[in-house]
Amino acid sequence: PNGRITRAEVATIFFRLLTDDARQRNWSSENNFSDVSADKWYNNAVSTLCHMGVLGGYSDGTFRPNAPITRAEFAKIAVSFSQANGSAVYSYFTDVKTTDWFAPYVTTAKDSSLIEGYSDGSFKPENRITRAEACAIVNRVLGRKPSKNHMKISGRIDWPDCTTADWFYEAIMEATNSHTYQMGKRV
């Protein structure tokens, strides 16, 4: 949970979260990145999400699929994917200036309750996002709220590196254990 997650992995996660209709309407296997060729396992995910405006690359024409993703980049993707509407740019965090490229996304993500900062008032936008942080944000994008009752299901998958004392325990359990779900609620 505390390990890094790559840009290609994040693209694949959000691609798989698309509805069948959205995936079909926006399907693309073409992109302009010099480092994402058609034969790569993540090509369709990257190409489709770029076509939708959810993902972007770098000014040098690369996507850097194997690079770890930052918290700022992940906030931008989460906001773009969820189509959350932003308001005026506000600096909720001590290390996010209103002039930073990511400030509008961080503001919108905070306003939409997609992200949280650290107890010291910072967001640490350039830090690599952890798998646990990414999981918690994806749950929020989908409106999935971990439930104490869900943690008691029979046949629950437990993970050796995820204990009940971890801040991310409920988020990981919510995301990795099967249950019937519709946007924003359990069924």
Model-predicted regions and their roles:
Residues 131, 135-138:
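Alpha-helical membrane segments in multi-pass integral membrane proteins
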